[in-house]
């Protein structure tokens, strides 16, 4: 059991201080189901002040906070994009605590009152949205509270789902924010997250759909292979190159295909790297049908989860039962959360890309406006997971290298500043000596009569003061 302290601020300057603890079994890795979860305790303390900020007076009942981009998405690959939400509500003063057993969801929502609202705020609170996003944020949060209460309660009580939300907070305002959110989903995917997504995104449509921005246009059928037999896809294939770093560049992507009832069935597996240097394996089953008019197009539709649809376009292929066999796929997809994601992958029989087929691939990639040289090389060694001690040592070494690098960068900056200062002082000193030389030359060139006139013009400050009757401040002459 581990307790983590947290503190959040509500709309009316109420402060929630809470501790969340979870007891997890040690024999499983990121596989928290209801049967695995023993218990969790949330202790919440609310402190209230009398003054209510003007910003929240317009919505006295429900105040929803999101980050500057509004509602965030988190995904478990290109098909499973899901929402993370934060909810602020005005909560009365008091202390409340609760223990979550297996039937936590029913218990929480039967007693939907002070604790339930407090727990949601404690887990899902984010920064307040900008004024432009405030209306949409309020609609989303209101929809969740009204339509997805049960699913929300289950997410709160599930360690993986709660960890997913916490992970998302590290993505705010990053240049790779979307990619970061999707990686969070990859790490913490489970059935509870899926159930919440199904309600919030698909069934009740609380989450606005991300629009297609045209990054992956549909290719013209003329640039695709004109003949393709789905049976050629049968057997095991490795993905050795991928275009999209978010979806296509996982380690150990070994996919096995077979045909049944005029469909191509793919058993897909890949590895997700964990922050400690380990990994765990994900898997999925996908089914494709061939376009009756264009053999180079395969459709993966009619999926229940988020109603996702993937369209595969075969740019080039060579299947001759040799190590140089390959199938080059470009794809575009859509689901209830995101319309227009896409990418491209190269399937090869070999775990490593044969160099001899690269010219063909470069030509094929150019047909859809892509440069094959920019594709990412994947790691298909598929070795065992390193021992925990080795992984920890590696992380320590990485940390040491990071610190050394930062120190070296600081030293370089200090050296640059010092060099600039030395150069500046050197120039000032040279200028001062030049002025001295000018003065000496000037005095040397004066005649005796000119020197006498110059001496006669010299007046003491006290004499000037008397002359002007103390009307001038003497400090300006001294």
Swiss-Prot record:
Residues 388-453 form a coiled coil. GO terms for molecular function: violaxanthin de-epoxidase activity. PROSITE patterns: LIPOCALIN. It comes from the Eukaryota. One of its GO terms (cellular component) is chloroplast thylakoid membrane. Pfam families: VDE (PF07137). Keywords: Chloroplast, Coiled coil, Membrane, Oxidoreductase, Plastid, Thylakoid, Transit peptide. It is a peripheral membrane protein. It is found in: Plastid, Chloroplast thylakoid membrane. Its EC number is 1.23.5.1. GO terms for biological process: chlorophyll metabolic process; xanthophyll cycle. The keyword Membrane applies. It catalyses: all-trans-violaxanthin + 2 L-ascorbate = all-trans-zeaxanthin + 2 L-dehydroascorbate + 2 H2O. Part of the xanthophyll (or violaxanthin) cycle for controlling the concentration of zeaxanthin in chloroplasts. Catalyzes the two-step mono de-epoxidation reaction. Stereospecific for all-trans xanthophylls. Zeaxanthin induces the dissipation of excitation energy in the chlorophyll of the light-harvesting protein complex of photosystem II. Belongs to the calycin superfamily. Lipocalin family. This is Violaxanthin de-epoxidase, chloroplastic. The lineage of its organism: Eukaryota, Viridiplantae, Streptophyta, Embryophyta, Tracheophyta. The gene is VDE1.
């Amino acid at each position: 059991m581990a307790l983590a302290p947290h503190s959040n601020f509500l709309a009316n300057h109420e402060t929630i201080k809470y501790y969340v603890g979870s007891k997890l079994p040690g024999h499983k890795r990121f596989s928290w189901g209801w049967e695995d979860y023993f218990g969790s305790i949330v202790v919440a303390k609310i402190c209230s002040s009398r003054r209510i900020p003007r910003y929240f007076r317009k919505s006295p009942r429900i105040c929803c906070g999101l980050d500057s981009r509004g509602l965030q998405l988190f995904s478990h690959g290109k098909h499973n994009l899901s929402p993370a939400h934060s909810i602020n509500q005005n909560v009365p003063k008091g202390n409340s605590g609760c223990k979550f057993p297996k039937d936590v969801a029913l218990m929480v929502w039967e007693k939907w009152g002070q604790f339930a609202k407090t727990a949601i705020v404690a887990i899902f609170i984010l920064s307040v949205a900008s004024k432009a996003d405030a209306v949409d944020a309020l609609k989303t949060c209101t929809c969740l509270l009204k339509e997805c209460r049960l699913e929300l309660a289950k997410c709160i009580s599930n360690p993986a789902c709660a960890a997913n939300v916490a992970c998302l907070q590290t993505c705010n305002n990053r240049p790779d924010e979307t990619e970061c959110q999707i990686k969070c989903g990859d790490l913490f995917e489970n059935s509870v997250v899926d159930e919440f997504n199904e309600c919030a995104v698909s069934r009740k449509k609380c989450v606005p759909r991300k629009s297609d921005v045209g990054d992956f246009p549909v290719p013209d059928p003329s640039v695709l292979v004109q003949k393709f037999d789905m049976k050629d896809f049968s057997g095991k294939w490795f993905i050795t190159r991928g275009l999209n770093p978010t979806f296509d560049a996982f380690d150990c992507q070994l996919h096995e295909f077979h045909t049944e009832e005029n469909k191509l069935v793919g058993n897909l597996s890949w590895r997700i790297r964990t922050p400690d240097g380990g990994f765990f394996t994900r898997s999925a089953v996908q089914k494709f049908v061939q376009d009756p008019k264009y053999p180079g197009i395969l459709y993966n539709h009619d999926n229940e989860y988020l109603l996702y649809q993937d369209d595969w376009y075969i740019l080039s292929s060579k299947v001759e039962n040799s190590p140089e066999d390959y199938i080059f796929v470009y794809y575009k997809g859509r689901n209830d959360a995101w319309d227009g994601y896409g990418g491209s992958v190269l399937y090869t029989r070999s775990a490593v890309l044969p160099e001899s087929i690269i010219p063909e691939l470069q030509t094929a990639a150019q047909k859809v406006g892509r440069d094959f040289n920019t594709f990412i090389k994947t790691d298909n060694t598929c070795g065992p997971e390193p021992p925990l001690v080795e992984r920890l040592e590696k992380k320590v070494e990485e940390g040491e290298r990071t610190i050394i690098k930062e120190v070296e960068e600081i030293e370089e900056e200090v050296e640059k500043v010092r060099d600039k200062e030395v150069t500046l002082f050197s120039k000032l000193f040279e200028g001062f000596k030049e002025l001295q030389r000018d003065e000496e030359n000037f005095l040397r060139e004066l005649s005796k009569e000119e020197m006498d006139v110059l001496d006669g013009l010299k007046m003491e400050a006290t004499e000037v003061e008397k002359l002007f009757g103390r009307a001038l401040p003497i400090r300006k002459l001294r």
